[in-house]
């Protein structure tokens, strides 16, 4: 096989024992869609503060403001894993449903609509207040003007795992909000990585991310009869043309961790 430089980072925290397993945990990656978890955190945070209710509706629109220069931009529908919102321009959808679509189908459109509502800076401030290291959200999806200026999101496996750990321990916003977030993450439709080789009875609340040669999966794994563990796998350097290779490698790592912790 051709030698490409592949970087893999893994961070595990076992909530049963407190044990950690870390490989390159502080390596910075383009987070791709894993950062949508942090948008969800701030949505629940602002709902808790009474700034809006999750049942409130927002207009579905495909026009967004660049954080770099205030210019307008739109998302490429063909690049979005979630297609059902695009034919509905001008209609409204609830914040709750937009949040669900952002997570379970990785809707870029829902992400940017929600980010315009809550504000990227507020998401970053909340990440900071939770003490989550190595995670930076500065812009929404496909903000080309910001990208050209080097204004990019970033994350580490340690940061993603700490995020999942806080959600699993129901310490984010409130116990009820954390439970709702877990429920959303359990509905994840992209299951090629962390859950792929685990026993069917094992629930996984997780969020995948993919862009270019970057493939990630971060989540909470619930083995039978014990407390869960938080796991993040981040990769760079797998072929864009062969996503199956990245997914297979991540699935193997997930299975290895699962077996090791049993």
Language-model regions, residue ranges each:
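Conserved catalytic neighborhood of penicillin-recognizing serine enzymes
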Residues: 65-112
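Active-site SXXK
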Residues: 18, 30-63, 102, 231
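Mid-domain, small-residue-enriched loop/turn segments at the edges of structured enzyme/sensor domains
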Residues: 7, 91-95, 99, 105-164, ...
């Amino acid at each position: 096989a051709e030698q490409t430089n592949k970087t893999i980072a893994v961070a595990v925290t076992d909530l049963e024992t407190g044990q950690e397993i870390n490989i390159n945990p502080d390596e910075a990656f383009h987070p791709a869609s894993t950062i949508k978890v942090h948008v969800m955190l701030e949505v629940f945070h602002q709902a808790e503060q009474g700034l809006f209710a999750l049942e409130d509706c927002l207009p579905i629109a495909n026009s967004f403001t660049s954080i770099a220069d205030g210019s307008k931009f739109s998302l490429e529908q063909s690049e979005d894993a979630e297609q059902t919102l695009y034919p509905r321009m001008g209609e409204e959808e609830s914040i709750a449903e937009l949040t669900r679509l952002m997570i379970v189908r990785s809707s870029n459109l829902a992400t940017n609509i929600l980010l315009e509502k809550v504000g990227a800076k507020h998401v970053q401030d909340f990440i900071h207040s939770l003490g989550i290291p190595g995670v930076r959200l500065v812009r929404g999806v496909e903000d080309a003007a910001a990208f050209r200026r080097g204004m990019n999101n970033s994350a580490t496996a340690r940061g993603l795992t700490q995020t999942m750990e806080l959600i699993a321990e129901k310490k984010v916003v409130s116990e009820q909000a954390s439970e709702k977030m877990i429920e959303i993450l359990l509905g994840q439709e992209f299951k090629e990585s962390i859950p792929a080789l685990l026993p069917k009875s094992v629930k996984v609340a997780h969020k995948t991310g993919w862009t270019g040669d970057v493939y990630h999966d971060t989540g909470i794994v619930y083995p039978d009869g014990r407390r869960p563990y938080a796991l993040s796998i981040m990769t760079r350097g797998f072929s864009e043309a062969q996503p199956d290779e990245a997914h297979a490698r991540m699935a193997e790592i997930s299975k290895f961790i699962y077996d090791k912790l049993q």
